Amino acid sequence: MQDFIRIHEDDNVAVALRPIAPGENLTVGQYQVTVGEEIPQGHKFALKPIAKGEEVIKYGFRIGYAKEDVAAGGWVHVHNLKTALGDLLEYQYEPVASG
């Protein structure tokens, strides 16, 4: 089983597919990451240092901005991520029919 997933090649975060312990070394594409803190399953961690105010990229798109500096291997969550969704938090799910 894979330990993480990087959804898009432009992402600067990956998602833990299991709890990841501090000190674990992971290779994510071209990034060598030593995890700095407990990363809960389903949560994001930085693949490279992300400076305060820098965009956080997931799915190949900006999902928010770092509220503080985040080290490579650091947990990226509500405590250090400001959403880029704006004040409007409504959306309509419209699945695309396949084939």
PLM ranges: what are they?
Residues 1-99:
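N-terminal small-residue-enriched
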